[in-house]
A protein has these predicted regions:
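Glycine-rich beta-strand-turn "strand-cap" elements at beta-sheet edges
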Residues: 1-4, 11, 39-48, 76-100
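Short hydrophobic/aromatic beta-strand micro-patches
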Residues: 9-11, 53-55
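Short, surface-exposed ligand-recognition loops at beta-strand->loop->(often short) alpha-helix junctions
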Residues: 10-21
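Short coil/turn motifs at secondary-structure junctions
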Residues: 13-15, 45, 57-59
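Intrinsically disordered, low-complexity acidic/polar segments
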Residues: 17-19, 61, 97-100
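An amphipathic, aromatic/His-enriched active-site/gating alpha helix that lines ligand/cofactor pockets
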Residues: 26-39, 55-89
């Protein structure tokens, strides 16, 4: 079971909601290529609020992701796309339903 995760909340600038969604969709291939990233989800919470949730088997995978292409692109586009800085939290997973 993965024990490490990141939960991020992103608030799109007014009129940038579609661009944020497309940006997140464009990150999927990078997430797939990250060996240490077990799961990666991008989702919409509300009209202008988006989220990312990803999991890692170990600290090394988490750190590789935080220093990887998605994180770099996210912060490079932050001022253009987001109303406020992305809210990123490291999360400890202590229980989960196994994937079948």
């Amino acid at each position: 079971m993965d024990r490490f995760a990141i939960s991020a909340t992103l608030e799109a600038r007014p009129g940038k909601e579609s661009e944020v969604e497309e940006f997140l969709k464009s990150a999927q291939p990078s997430a797939i290529q990250e060996v240490g990233t077990t799961t990666w989800f991008a989702f919409r919470i509300g009209p202008a609020t988006f989220g990312i949730f990803d999991t890692f088997a170990n600290e090394a995978g988490l750190q590789a992701h935080l220093n990887g292409a998605i994180a770099k692109a996210l912060f490079a586009k932050a001022e253009e796309l987001f109303a406020k800085p992305p809210q990123i939290q490291q999360v400890e997973i202590f229980a989960a339903k196994p994937l079948s």
